[in-house]
Amino acid sequence: KTGVEYGDYTLNHVEGCSHGCKYPCYAFLMKKRFGKVKDYSEWLEPCIVENTLDLLGKELPKYRNKINILHLCFTTDPFMYKRPDIQTLSLEVLRRANAANVRCSVLTKGILPTELAELPLRNEYGITVVSLSEAFREEYEPGAAPIQDRINSLQELSNQGCYTWVSIEPFPTPNIHEQNLLELLQRIHFVDKIIFGRLHYNKAVSQFNGYQEFYNECARKVIHFCEQNNISYHIKEKTLIEK
């Protein structure tokens, strides 16, 4: 059971992540704080939890009637870019969960495989996109998949009738990266849901004059766009703060 505000149950079957996000990455900060990893370089060498499928076989019968949706993943990436071993395991986890009549959601900065469209349940397939800029991606998500490749894989699943969503989080302030939010929204117009959230744990955010009003304005743009295009949405806590 996860404490993440839009989550239900979660499965994290890998320790670490080779995407090496530098926003900074909240999962890395927590793992380092509690002594699970020594440093950034260790975090970049992900390790599969070897008994994942055995644990899944034991846990699914216990929890399947309680689970509304099982999320992969909040502290790692289920379709880690250029890691076919992790991708294969994630697909098998999804197949077994669906076989137990448990719906799943996934969130990745990798490439969503087309095989996901063959799964029997109405799963929810998502990608993170906080900018359309490859230069920004290379600086802040150095090991992740190129932005357009992510979006194309999501659009292919959408074209095949799958439920798709995008997480625009953590969205940077203009002093970190200046961009056109509407352009980003229009590029992902085909999705069923958008989640929008501010950037935390980066002091540059508070150095931007009027940062809260900036996030308020961005959140309102997301809400307006979603309502105009019949897209469901969720604005993360502490992103939109009305006076």
Tell where the protein language model's regions lie, with residue ranges:
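N-terminal [4Fe-4S]-dependent radical SAM core
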Residues: 1-18, 22-69
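Residues in flexible loops and secondary-structure boundaries
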Residues: 17-19, 25, 33, 80, ...
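Non-transmembrane, interaction-prone segments in cytosolic or luminal domains
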Residues: 4-16, 138-140, 146-149, 196, ...
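Acidic carboxylate-rich catalytic motifs and surrounding loops in phosphoryl-/glycosyl-chemistry enzymes
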Residues: 108-110, 170, 228-243
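Conserved AdoMet/S-adenosylmethionine-binding subsite of the radical SAM
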Residues: 51-221, 225
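Generic preference for hydrophobic/aromatic residues in regular secondary structure cores
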Residues: 1, 44-48, 116, 231-233, ...
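Generic detector of bulky aromatic hydrophobic side chains
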Residues: 6, 146, 162-164, 218-219, ...
